[in-house]
Amino acid sequence: MYNFVKIFQSNFIDINKLSKFEIFLKTIFRIYSSPGRTHLLAHAADISAKYAVRKIYEYMRTDEEGIRILKEKPLLIRQDICFNELKKLPKNTLGYKYMEFLETYKLHAHDREVSHFIKDINESYILTRYRQIHDIAHVVYNLNISIEAEAALKLIELIQTKLPITLLAILIAPFMTPLYRFQYIFEHNIPSNFLCPNFDYTYNDDYNYIDEMSLKQYEYYLTDYFHVEKRESQSFYYKLYKYYFDNLNNSSHVRGSIIYGYQNKNYNDIHYDKLNNEYLYLKNNIKNYFHFQYKPRKLLLTNLYPWAYKTAIQTNKPLHSIYVEKWFDKDIDLFRKKYNITPLPSNLNLMAGIN
């Protein structure tokens, strides 16, 4: 409680409604071109969340666990949580899985933007908690941080919170999700010469690829589909990967994420070709197949959204009103069973799961 009072006092910005509306419009127009700038989404959520947050507050005031959360105002910050201790917990506990997720994707709850524009301290706390709990939602629903997985989680959050900004994310996500994604998966570490011009970017048994689902290998011709003329160049694939890594944090150039897979040591890569305004992926020149192919946009619309809707309505309590910190040392499956949470189905795990 004490920590959040200080956070609230140091972060609240008191501006009039006209200024809030101006900020809202500016952030909405900038979110699409810069989706990686999460503070823009947070500001838009702050300004548009008034009535939804008030409804959440009214619900939590009538719930025993919610009352305790509002009174104590726990936070996922170093002052309240000993994160290093969570790493020492048994591997199937919620706390261990949470830390594994954060370290895999280089995240921290501290990175979540606090509420700035909500005057009521309880309502401001609810919105801040919702953002901090977001990463735990990834863990309990077993969703990675790809665009399609984030969109599925936003649908769950929309049903549980009714926050308008989640609806915006759900509507925009299909337009930002790649049409195709091909994955290049290593069982252990990435070869040291992976970004060297002479690296052979083809399916090679020496690298011990994982094929967990025994999926059919696909023939795919880069030049025929993407009209790329330069792939015969010895340095083409090197330039392709170099461009991807150089622009990884520039969402206007690269739409997508690195997904860490098997044992948190794999790279599954996509590349956005700015010149052709299309997505480019590895072509196997020797065996004429990719290791794994799927269609993220189709997956989102036909599989992830239906699953997210179903699991959200059957979950018996929204995450923000659960004292999840008290569950860190307990089995994650018991947590899911207690609140009737259905994680991502195993058949979708390789595409959108944490693995």
From Swiss-Prot:
Subcellular location: Mitochondrion inner membrane
Disulfide bridge map: none
Topological relation to the membrane, as annotated: Peripheral membrane protein
Note: This protein may be expected to contain an N-terminal transit peptide but none has been predicted.
Residues annotated as binding Zn(2+): 134-135, 138, 150
Function statement: Lyase that catalyzes the C1-decarboxylation of 4-hydroxy-3-methoxy-5-(all-trans-polyprenyl)benzoic acid into 2-methoxy-6-(all-trans-polyprenyl)phenol during ubiquinone biosynthesis.
Originating organism: Plasmodium falciparum (isolate 3D7)
Keywords: Lyase, Membrane, Metal-binding, Mitochondrion, Mitochondrion inner membrane, Ubiquinone biosynthesis, Zinc
Top EC group: lyase
Protein name per its UniProtKB record: Ubiquinone biosynthesis protein COQ4 homolog, mitochondrial
Family: Belongs to the COQ4 family.
Pathway in which this enzyme or protein is active: Cofactor biosynthesis; ubiquinone biosynthesis
Cofactor dependency: Zn(2+)
Listed GO CC annotations: extrinsic component of mitochondrial inner membrane
Catalysed reactions listed for this entry: a 4-hydroxy-3-methoxy-5-(all-trans-polyprenyl)benzoate + H(+) = a 2-methoxy-6-(all-trans-polyprenyl)phenol + CO2
Superkingdom as given in the UniProt entry: Eukaryota
Record flagged with keyword Lyase: yes
Subunit: Component of a multi-subunit COQ enzyme complex.
GO biological process: ubiquinone biosynthetic process
InterPro entries noted in UniProt: Coq4, Coq4_euk
Pfam family membership, one: Coq4
